[in-house]
Amino acid sequence: EEVLGTYKSRTDEKYSRIVTKFVRQLRHPTRIRETELGDLISDVLKDALGVDIFLLGSGSIRNEQLGPIVTKGDLRECFPYDDAVHLVYVTGAQLKHMFMRMLRDEVWEGAHCEFYQLSRGLLVEYDQATHSFLRFEFEGEPVDDDKVFSLGLQHFHFLNMKDSFDITPEELRKNHSIRVISTSCTQVIEEALQAGQHQNATVARGVVGRRATSRNPIGPSSA
């Protein structure tokens, strides 16, 4: 009993350790829209792993809010899936094809579909009525079909690329070899936040329109 008590005490101490503090609480109210928490975590993984784009499985975020004080336990509860991360390379044309699959009508009609949070730099505006992109930009420039981008994906989503994106690893290997660049995305997130990255006011900017949908071409939306 004494041993168990000591173990519990050490475990409690470990998970109550403060990882970071945000300027305010960040929210993730739905998995089928861009969210503050989705922006934060996708940005952390993009920057820490050095990829052009990180597509974060929206369902990986299990809580509707996090912070402003974030303990190790809070982070693990909010983001419990400790996947490896795969680095793949996609052309602009393939990236657009992947998003067409992700934004198909079934997603908005409540079907069980994967949805993704976008890292900083990628802006997609989609007209649901015409099934076309109004804007598809990277770093402020229209995405060229032939340009190749480095893209980070969690292991689960890498394994399910065909269903989620209607594309296969075999197709992407024609662009470049595929490799694992992290064995623990949770550790990457924790270490980046603990180092003081992504915790200032710019993280808490609200939803900034990295991905927007509209039934009419009304211009950028922050939906």
Task: List each language-model region with its residue ranges.
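Catalytic centers of hydrolytic enzymes
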Residues: 1-48, 52-223
